[in-house]
From Swiss-Prot:
Residue intervals passing through the bilayer: 34-54, 65-85, 216-236, 245-265, 569-591, 611-631, 644-664
Protein name stated in the entry: Potassium-transporting ATPase ATP-binding subunit
Binding site for ATP: 341, 345, 372-379, 390
Complex formation: The system is composed of three essential subunits: KdpA, KdpB and KdpC.
Lineage: Bacteria, Bacillati, Bacillota, Bacilli, Bacillales
Chain positions recorded as Mg(2+) binding sites: 513, 517
Annotated Gene Ontology cellular component terms: plasma membrane
Length: 675
């Protein structure tokens, strides 16, 4: 969320430092087996400081042991700090959200119409409340009366107020948001503890953050490597005794810490938490870390045309009559079919009709209004004298044919002309007579071509689903740059599209906001629901966009890719580090007893004691150096998967081999004067 950037300050750093010490508790640290091994080594070193000869005679001074102890402690604190700082972001967000719902009261509307002030926690679903200008909405609900602007910045971070009114797509309100003009009467939809704000707090606080399958697999690998290195170190002791080489326990502890994958072990949790945080920064709530991670595996994106590829509010641009004598009749009929249509398209038709018609049009019409449905794909009104409908060409043509009406010869060409321009044609009929076509203009969002090109490079195929005919769909798909399209697609057809792609082994992501989208959102591997959407859609999805911007799916998928690549890059760096440190330290440790090892001491480290201290210091510092990468993620923009893989292998693989040699040598050049 944009409004929590103010929390990245000194206070957060201090809190993270405090948590770093709290996480030294073995009960906390055992969740990270690698760092737990480091802590065990630190405790053993502390015992050696107090009782130097407890494990046999040692030539190491107490000062040297204290140095090892301090470096091991700092290593653990650095690892704890990276995790605590990442967690601190979520806690800062949760605190800001709690402020939005603290000490709220509500103006409850009684059955007799009177008002009663109650505590917001006493509200029950189904009750009606009134909220005036300057008051905070106390609970989630639906506007049943009134029109007002609402400041949702406490939730979304967007400072511009939004208009809320009954009916249409913008009647849902969230508890904790502020009414900044007029008044609203709201039907309560949630009770205390179950509101959207409560769920947000639980999500961003991450109290129940479970490890994702990939994290578990990687942790298993790292734990196995740790055990292998422990076995290697343990076998060194009898070998050293056989060769009459004195290897103090403190040296073996330090060597163990240097060789096990402490770098990635110290950063792994922070990478996962930071990945979820980056999604939150885009005003998207992830219900689990797994949801963000699966985004990284997505290779097919199902995108709605309306609202995702186009701006969503198709605007009535022109009335096209079957002949010019029908123009006035077409305008009046289009107006009548839309007068009770609360959709943006319907309202734009009413506006255009008023602009074009010279005489005054009626404000109210007595009759039965038929709303648009995905099945009928038409809407209109039936009165005692007349029936007027507008709708999709196929639906209207079938309706007229069923009633033995005539189809004008030029109606199809009028529809084709509109479709070829990327618009949406709606045929208008009056008493089963076709009058003409309404041209609804679609406007494609800026910058989509470049973004789709970028996704294509990353190996992601884009599929546009639209209820438009094939000609309109093809025109828009070509202009927007999507890979494929599915025309005349109903909500239930999306499930088939998703299942077909999944049957081919693809990982599918999609967006949706309506109740009819809920099954498809649940079927998709990744479902992004709009905050302005229905409760069922938000429950079915595993991601919720607070800005209700469907194009966010593109950003979320890129963040998921970045999360996986960051984890892979830092794991590669850590393991390459271990290999380099092994060949850097072991020869220096053994060369005093085994002269042949001198030739392998390519770094010319001054002494075994200096080598160990230098490696330990490097081991601690590299965790701090990599925290920014763990938090921000590796760069993935504009590159293909193959290019990113090669770059990461060069930077983090080869770099992971070279950096330890250089770093340890530089530190050794300084340390040799003190050891």
């Amino acid at each position: 969320m944009h409004h929590v950037n103010k929390y990245f300050n000194q206070t957060m750093v201090i809190e993270a430092l405090k948590m770093s010490f709290y996480k030294l508790n073995p009960k906390q640290l055992i969740k990270n087996p690698i760092m737990f091994v480091v802590e065990v080594g630190m405790i053993l070193t502390l015992i050696l400081i107090c009782f130097p000869d407890i494990f046999g005679t040692s030539y190491l001074s107490r000062g040297y042991l204290i140095t090892i102890f301090i470096i091991l402690l700092i290593t653990i604190l650095f690892a704890n700090f990276s995790e605590a700082f990442a967690e601190g972001r979520g806690k800062a967000q949760a605190d800001s959200l709690r402020q939005a719902q603290s000490n709220l009261t509500a103006r409850l509307i009684e059955e007799n119409g009177a008002y009663r002030i109650v505590n917001a926690t006493e509200l029950k679903a189904g009750q009606n409340i009134r909220v005036e200008n300057g008051e905070t909405i106390p609970a989630d609900g639906v506007v049943i009366n009134g029109l007002a602007t609402v400041d949702e910045s406490a939730i979304t971070g967007e400072s511009a107020p939004v208009i809320k009114e009954s009916g249409g797509d913008f009647d849902g309100v969230i508890g904790g948001t502020l009414v900044t003009s007029d008044w609203l009467e709201i039907r309560v939809e949630s009770e205390a503890g179950t509101s959207f704000l409560d769920k947000m707090i639980a999500l961003v606080e991450g109290a129940e953050r479970n490890k994702t399958p990939n994290e578990i697999a990687l942790f298993t690998l790292l734990t196995t490597l740790t055990i292998i290195f422990l076995v290697v170190i343990v076998t060194l002791y009898p070998i050293a005794s056989y060769l009459h080489l004195i290897l103090p326990i403190a040296m073996l502890i330090a060597l163990t810490v240097c060789l096990i994958p402490t770098t990635i072990g110290g950063l792994l949790s922070a990478i996962g938490i930071a990945g979820m945080d980056r999604v939150t920064q885009f005003n998207v709530l992830a219900k689990s870390g797994r949801a963000v991670e699966v985004c990284g595996d997505v290779d097919v994106m199902i995108l709605d045309k309306t609202g995702t590829i186009t701006y969503g509010n198709r605007i009535a641009s022109e009335f096209l009559p079957v002949n010019q004598q029908m123009l006035e009749k077409l305008i009046v009929a289009a107006y009548m079919s839309s007068i009770y249509d609360d959709t943006p398209e319907g309202k734009s038709i009413v506006r255009l009709a008023k602009q074009m018609y010279i005489n005054e049009l009626p404000k109210d019409i007595d009759g039965t209004y038929k709303t648009f449905t995905a099945e009928t794909r038409m809407s209109g009104i039936i009165t005692n004298e007349i029936s007027v409908f507008k709708g999709a060409p196929n639906s209207m043509i079938n309706l007229v044919k069923q009633q033995q009406g005539n189809i004008p010869l030029n109606i199809e060409s009028l529809c084709m002309d509109v479709s070829s321009k990327g618009g949406t044609p709606l045929i208008v009929i009056e008493n089963n007579v076709m009058l003409g076509v309404i041209y609804l203009k679609d406007v494609i969002k800026d910058g989509l071509v470049e973004r789709f090109t970028e996704l294509r490079k990353m190996g992601i195929e884009t599929v546009m689903c639209t209820g438009d005919n094939a000609l309109t769909a093809a025109t828009i798909a070509k202009e927007a740059g999507v890979d494929r399209f599915v025309a005349e697609c109903k909500p239930e057809d999306k499930i088939k599209v998703i299942k077909d792609e999944q049957a081919k082994g693809h990982i599918v992501a999609m967006t949706g906001d309506g109740t009819n989208d809920a099954p498809a959102l649940a079927q998709a591997n990744i479902g992004l629901a709009m905050n302005s959407g229905t409760i069922s859609a938000k429950e079915a999805a595993n991601l919720i966009d607070l800005d209700s911007n469907p194009t966010k799916l593109i950003e979320v998928v890129k963040i998921g890719k970045q999360l996986l690549m960051t984890r892979g890059a830092l794991t590669t760096f850590s393991l390459a580090n271990d290999v380099a440190k092994y060949f850097a330290i072991l020869p220096a440790l053994m060369m005093s007893t085994i002269p042949e090892m001198t030739s392998l001491n390519i770094m010319h480290l001054s002494s075994p004691k200096s080598a160990i201290i230098s490696a330990l210091i490097f081991n601690a510092l590299i965790i701090v150096a990599l925290i920014p990468i763990a938090m921000k993620g590796v760069k993935v923009k504009g590159y293909s998967i193959d290019r990113i893989f090669i770059n990461n292998m060069l930077i983090y693989g080869l770099g992971g081999l070279i950096v330890p040699f250089l770093g340890i040598k530089l530190i050794d050049m300084i340390v040799q004067f003190f050891v």
